[in-house]
Amino acid sequence: LNYDKCYSFELGDKKDENGTFIGRKRGERCPHCGCELIDILVIDGKDERFSFLGLDGIITASCCPNCVTFATDGISNRFTLDGKNEILEYEGMEENYYRDEEIESLVNNRFVVSEKERHVFYGAYGDDVNTIGGFASWVQDWEYRECPECGKKMKYLAQIHWDTIEDCAEGTLYIEICPECKIVTMFHQQT
């Protein structure tokens, strides 16, 4: 349920939206709360570093940053390898707690992917490391969701600690994948 390779995100001079990155506005609003929808993670599977994923294309994981923190079932997407996706139905909130400035801060982060591979447990060492692959730093208990399409357990794909991209935020966003069905699911944990 885990990948045997791991890469981290590091602070760079500026984010490069031509490859793998965290946070981009979609230009759409959440149908539940009205918050700006974001592509929280874009992975370029054509990048040799991510060949271990076995997906030769671009994977985009999108969510409402407001609703995903409250959605018990998380938010799932069906993706295509050309970087497009469809956000599947989810249970959202009525009230939006995100201000526009917070969305700007989130999408204007400077994270870039590490050039060198990290130890497979690198992401499990602390609560301030954003990773792709390897093992997660579970805030609560480990949690491998079932694919909403086929019902099999999904593989852990990535983690993003909210406070690394948004001041004073709490908790961690976990992203899991079913490569066969081309589904990603995002969910939140915090103490």
Please provide the spans of the model-predicted regions.
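Preference for intrinsically disordered or flexible, low-complexity segments
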Residues: 1-191
